[in-house]
């Protein structure tokens, strides 16, 4: 956790990590503000959240993410670009790692775990960055070699195997439900019009 005040000596804020959020404007990246921050501040990492989370915005398409990654690279070649890909796995033909993201993170309890994995997450991307994340998430010297625990490998493997079909069926159901709700004048979930 970043931490609000830095009072905890274990928060990221206590380690000197600062955070600044640039909100979307009408579901589009605020390119002007992003470029301005990248030019004015010592930015080490840009994080992009693909899913809508609990907000009412649309999830970001891979094309929108690719476009902003190119814009970020025009301004700063060295910044690390991380995409939180929760709920974004397997919904389009490309993934964030295919379009220039340095590191991609997500949950195994959602799309990639096929709804079967009871816990867990994943980190994928450039080898040196995955190594750094593994060292921080577990323990220095153990890193990625710790692996899954609690006898959950069976659920993880089943989840990853079932994920493509589970995601496909979830998308079909969401599109169908959205269309049906719109026919009764409930227009808040217009997924059937989303690419």
Q: What positions do the PLM features span?
A:
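Conserved PLP-enzyme active-site core in the AAT-like
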Residues: 1-168, 172, 178-181
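Hydrophobic alpha-helical bundle architecture
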Residues: 184-186
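Single conserved hydrophobic/aromatic residue that forms the stacking wall/gate
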Residues: 188-195
């Amino acid at each position: 956790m970043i931490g609000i005040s830095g009072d905890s000596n274990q928060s990221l804020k206590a380690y000197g990590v600062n955070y600044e959020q640039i909100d979307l404007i009408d579901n589009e990246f605020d390119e002007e503000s992003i470029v301005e921050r990248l030019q004015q501040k010592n930015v080490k990492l840009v994080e992009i959240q693909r899913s809508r989370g609990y907000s009412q915005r649309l999830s970001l398409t891979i094309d929108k993410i690719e476009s902003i990654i190119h814009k970020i690279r025009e301004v700063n070649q060295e910044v690390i670009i991380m995409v939180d890909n929760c709920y974004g796995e397997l919904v389009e033909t490309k993934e964030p790692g295919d379009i220039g993201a340095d590191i991609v993170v997500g949950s195994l309890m959602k799309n990639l775990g096929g709804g079967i994995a009871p816990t867990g997450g994943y980190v994928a991307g450039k080898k040196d960055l995955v190594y750094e994340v593994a060292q921080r998430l577990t323990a220095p010297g153990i890193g990625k070699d710790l692996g899954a625990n609690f006898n959950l490998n069976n659920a993880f493997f089943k989840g990853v195997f079932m994920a493509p079909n589970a995601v496909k069926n979830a998308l079909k159901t969401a599109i169908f439900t959205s269309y049906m709700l719109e026919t009764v004048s409930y227009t808040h979930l217009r997924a059937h019009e989303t690419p």
